[in-house]
């Protein structure tokens, strides 16, 4: 478009800070929220009350990408396989802590606890990168992390990936088994990212932005960039995103109920 774009990262508080910044800005189409499944779906499952409504406070623009979660442990830690990790969790209850930088990663870990029939204890962090760093340093013993943020640390040996929570292995880390291959049949977990604006934004501006994102998502360089970071394009405009978001909120509420996670 020839227009300058300023990226303003606002981590922390389960995305509440970023959401507040977007919703308090002028609704003129110049402030776009690029949010994850945590802010746009998972928070609705984890919190009794939210300072925002992930559906009615936003007008969807476009789905952007999704990335399978990695189950990571310290690179020099004792666990070399998922079976070894689960074995310790069962034989020595209470000895393993997981890091969680958002509501999404917390529910992934609790879903893992439920599927593996173990109990690891959550330690909250301000953001996903802090949780990943805590695993690399051994401050916590495991975490679920986005492929895009953890793969370089896995390649360097600072982290060890025990499994990728997807139906098939990731081309970005082909040596890492799927959770099913590693001994946890059917376990999958993805993070996704989508774009939205305040629902107070005029429809004309919303339509322009949605069309722009549609064009961006079809560019070969967009697909190449996502593949390089271990993600994949998620194509879908406002209506597709609206339906997808509704399904995701239902999914994460079901996961929270099944894993017996109490709402905060």
Regions flagged by a language model, labelled:
Residues 14-18, 38, 42, 81, ...:
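Stable alpha-helical elements in mature extracytoplasmic
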Residues 24-30, 45-130, 179-181, 192-225:
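Hinge/capping helix and adjacent helix->loop/strand transition within the periplasmic-binding protein
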Residues 1-56, 93-96, 104-105, 117-144, ...:
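N-terminal (or domain-start) structured segment
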Residues 155, 203-264:
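An extracytoplasmic/periplasmic, membrane-proximal ligand-sensing/linker region
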Residues 77-78, 149, 168, 178, ...:
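Short, well-ordered alpha-helical scaffold segment located
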Residues 36-37, 75, 146-148, 166-167, ...:
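Short secondary-structure boundary segments
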Residues 51-64, 99, 119-124, 141-142, ...:
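Short beta-strand->loop
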């Amino acid at each position: 478009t020839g227009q300058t774009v300023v990226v303003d990262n606002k981590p922390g508080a389960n995305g509440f800070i970023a959401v507040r910044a977007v919703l308090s800005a002028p609704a003129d189409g110049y402030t776009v929220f690029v949010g994850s499944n945590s802010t746009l779906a998972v928070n609705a499952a984890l919190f009794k009350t939210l300072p925002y409504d992930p559906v009615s406070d936003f007008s969807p623009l476009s789905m952007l990408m999704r990335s399978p979660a990695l189950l990571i442990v310290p690179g020099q830690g004792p666990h070399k396989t998922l079976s070894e990790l689960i074995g310790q969790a069962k034989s020595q209850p209470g000895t393993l802590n997981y890091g969680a930088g958002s509501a999404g990663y917390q529910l992934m870990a609790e879903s893992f606890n439920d599927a593996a029939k173990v109990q690891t204890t959550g330690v909250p962090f301000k953001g996903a990168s802090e949780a990943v760093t805590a695993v690399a340093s051994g401050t916590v013993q495991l975490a679920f992390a986005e492929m895009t943020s953890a793969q370089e640390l896995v390649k360097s040996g600072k982290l060890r990936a025990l499994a990728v929570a997807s139906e098939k292995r990731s081309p970005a880390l082909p040596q890492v088994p799927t959770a099913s291959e590693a001994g946890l049949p059917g376990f999958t977990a993805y993070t996704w990212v989508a774009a939205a604006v305040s629902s107070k934004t005029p429809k004309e501006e919303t339509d322009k932005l949605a069309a722009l994102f549609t064009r961006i998502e079809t560019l070969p360089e967009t697909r190449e960039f996502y593949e390089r970071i271990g993600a994949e394009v998620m194509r879908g405009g406002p209506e597709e995103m609206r339906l997808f978001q509704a399904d995701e909120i239902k999914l994460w509420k079901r996961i929270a109920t099944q894993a017996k996670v109490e709402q905060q």
